[in-house]
Curated annotation (Swiss-Prot):
Upper lineage: Eukaryota, Metazoa, Chordata, Craniata, Vertebrata
Stated name of the protein: Secernin-2
Pfam families found in the cross-reference section: Peptidase_C69 (PF03577)
Active site per the UniProt annotation: C20
Annotated family: Belongs to the peptidase C69 family. Secernin subfamily.
GO terms classed as biological process: proteolysis
InterPro entries: Peptidase_C69 (IPR005322)
GO molecular function annotation: cysteine-type exopeptidase activity; dipeptidase activity
Natural source organism: Xenopus tropicalis
Amino acid sequence: MSSSVPPSSVPSSSVPPSSCDCFVSLPPASLASVVLFGKNSDRPRDEVQEIVFRPAGSHPPGSKLKCTYIEVEQVAETLAVLLSRPAWLWGAEMGANEKGVCIGNEAVWTKEPVTEGEALLGMDLVRLALERAPSAQQAVQVITDLLGRYGQGGSCREDPEPLIYHNTFLLCDCSEAYVLETAGPYWAAERIVEGARNLSNQLSISVCPWREHPQLRSHALQQGWWDGQGDFNFSAVYSLEKQPVRMEAAKLRYGAGQELLRMQAGHITVKSMLNILRDKKSGICMDSGGFRTTASMVSVLPRSPDVPCIHLLTATPDPSRSVYKPFIFGPHVTQVPWVLSPSFGEHDPTQQIPRFQTQVDRRHDLYRQHQGALEACKANKQEAEETLRKKQLKLEDENLHWVDTILDPSDSADPVGGSDMFLICVEKELELYKGIGEKQCTHTEV
């Protein structure tokens, strides 16, 4: 039987801060007729995030699927998915599928205690929903069904000292978005059909959820968290009464994110979303207490069926010093090897019991080259760092021009690359960093 950890002790001040920020913009908040999704994945600062592509698949009846810790029943058909994930686990921090569904998850602590027993991680639920759901609404159903059947639990970091939390999710497709917030097996969901919304590691659904767990209110009554009088406010009822320091910081980021969206309402573009995710003053682009933004993602989901969805990913830490690279699903897409971490098979510390007793080097090629270029420049002078950043932004501008060409149906130019777009962009970035290393970051004109 899994043991419960009292909510008052999770999270404790001895555990590093864990934070993420998710954003979605729908018309009329978006300038164009698109839905925009964005997420910063804030994780232990040395954790490597890889970009994984998995094609659609067919599976025989009775198949089992091994997730990070447990097995679940496999479905007959799975969709092609693009995942940005911590390299040690099965699931994903954020991702998209071939139908234009995007999902990101966040850590949350509530009055409902977390459990030490291994179950599905929130990141497993992200991937399972992407593989199984052709719409955001169906993804909500997939997650809540799996939550009810298998539960959520297990350590969410590669360390002997466990970090355990429950999850909130932001899910969207080209027509609508959903916020799904959980407290143990209990949950509430909100539907969004216009405007902008953000999440920052706290319950945010108040009254009149779109849907909710059938025992959500009766459980709160039974626990004495709600008296049954007046409107039922999910976030007020299930949130911790005494918030840890990290949750107070989440409130500040949540408010800052709301303000950044409000200031640009009606004019939110891909560039707007990139700038929000790079905002250091608010803490949205974070580096604090052993945690930092280890990967970032922005997706453009056009409402026109004739225009493809485009997903931009960094695959490297700190979006303010990284390059967003576009990906499009297509019949000839393959895994880009330079953003895939090495495999350790049965020797992987995640597969051994007790888990996480040793460490392995999970850095992929792009991560290594990015890290090397930044360190080489830092060892020289500020001018070298500024020169590198200018070169990164120049490369990203080329990537964004490519995106604009594809999104503009009136542009007759043939978008060369298509399925190879992400691969080409990764290759260019690798060449940039190799050149920097060879020149030892000497100051040159861009």
